[in-house]
Amino acid sequence: MIPPEIRRSVLLQKAIKLALAGTLLTFASFSATAADPSSDTETPQPPDILLGPLFNDVQNAKLFPDQKTFADAIPNSDPLMILADYRMQRNQSGFDLRHFVDVNFTLPKAGEKYVPPAGQSLREHIDGLWPVLTRSTKNVEKWDSLLPLPESYVVPGGRFREIYYWDSYFTMLGLAESGHWDKVADMVANFGYEIDAWGHIPNGNRTYYLSRSQPPFFAFMVELLAQHEGDDALKEYLPQLQKEYAYWMEGVETLQPGQQNQRVVKLEDGSVLNRYWDDRDTPRPESWVEDIATAKSNPNRPATEIYRDLRSAAASGWDFSSRWMDNPQQLSTIRTTTIAPVDLNALLYQLEKTLARASAAAGDRAKASHYDALANARQKAIEMHLWNNKEGWYADYDLKNNKIRDQLTAAALFPLYVNAAAKDRAAKVAAAAQAHLLQPGGLATTSVKSGQQWDAPNGWAPLQWVAAEGLQNYGQDDVAMEVTWRFLTNVQHTYDREKKLVEKNDVSSTGTGGGGGEYPLQDGFGWTNGVTLKMLDLICPQEKPCDSVPSTRPASLSATPTKTPSAATQ
């Protein structure tokens, strides 16, 4: 048998021609080092483009239980060479696809199972996890789908081996609570680097995440850092805040009423709102087979349309939820891109307010007034188009049918979280959340049981925090306490039984991890750790902090709201 390295050398030119014969591939050279992002960095290609038919065949063969495994695999040589070899060998007798993959790729290693020391309190366990979840990837392999970052960062845990955008804010809350302001600063710096390098913060630092972003929490991150560093943080990251805003608002200047462009839409009355969007309309590399199956289940819709809506739901962070579907029991009815989400628009209101504050800190009063005006216009659009007067709660706007949607979700609390809600409406939202979403173990994401992970009976740490702080902002302390106490009790019971914190919780009871979705329940877990620490300090006085959830429910919350409703929303 001819050794593989000799065969490659001899057949190099022929192999390249064969590789190019059946598939048009786009390649971009890029630095595998987190270098100066101001240079003209070409966008690196995701593995489904680099590997073409090989990627498709491996994923369809279901060689790995998790489709993310091969998406994260590192080619051992030029992908063009590997693809050429594959084309030459795949039809030969006895060809073994799994062996071919093992020879040509380095597969991601399973993370070492963390066994916490016995007898740790909840707080001690979380503090001990921060170094376990910290990664540094200043340099990566040339063909790795992982994107390098200049500073260290904290990953969520489990199958999530990279940093994720909106997860990170809630993780950073916990890091700050633990006194790790250096890690907070590093993570803000990483996101600023990504904005400079790619024009936006991608879903995660993988090539296959570059075509979309996630809920825009960068403004909150900078505001958090400013609590420690003062206005210097606002001034330092003003350019990146402006670039992120430009990404979300791209094309707004030329939109006519009723038109849409990528992430921005203009309604018939001239109101401007935003939606989630992915630049690609193909199956997600990390969920390749699942997306193809979803598209095939609804032959009445173009597959590309379904793929973009699946991807855009991933951009929302809520992948997946009945919130985006016409039929909650049929994922292929998803239509994320025809919905203007209430939470996204609340977050962009916050971005506009932060831009105004940062501009003022930098001494640019004209820009500060400009961003304040944009925030005021968005706040009016939220009140006009994202309030369901019949039901009495904030909801998403249906761009396809030009009307407000009826479904109550935990996203209804976001206008309260950013202080964009009218006071009387905030009270109605509090009552609705208490009546329809509050469960024994915390706040349910929706009241619909669809089998999707962003539906009942699951509750997610970030939504508990948004609800608790949003309710406090408007004096709804009793409901805020119920959300906080019930979720913390759930987390404590899970920790007592399993000695871990999980990605999501079943809130229909206490002490049960959540289910549903595309992958098994993950532990770690960054944002649950962060929210748990914040909530522990919410229920216990500063002079007597608690390291675990008290056995008796406190009479009231200890902390005061970090924000108060603006004059415009009284």
From Swiss-Prot:
GO terms for molecular function: alpha,alpha-trehalase activity. It is found in: Periplasm. Its EC number is 3.2.1.28. Keywords: Glycosidase, Hydrolase, Periplasm, Signal. One of its GO terms (biological process) is cellular hyperosmotic response. Substrate binds at residues 159, 166-167, 203, 212-214, 284-286, 317, 518. The active site is at 319 (proton donor/acceptor), 503 (proton donor/acceptor). Provides the cells with the ability to utilize trehalose at high osmolarity by splitting it into glucose molecules that can subsequently be taken up by the phosphotransferase-mediated uptake system. This is Periplasmic trehalase. GO terms for cellular component: periplasmic space. Residues 544-570 are annotated as: Disordered. The gene is treA. It is an enzyme of class 3 (hydrolase). Residues 554-570 have a biased composition (Low complexity).
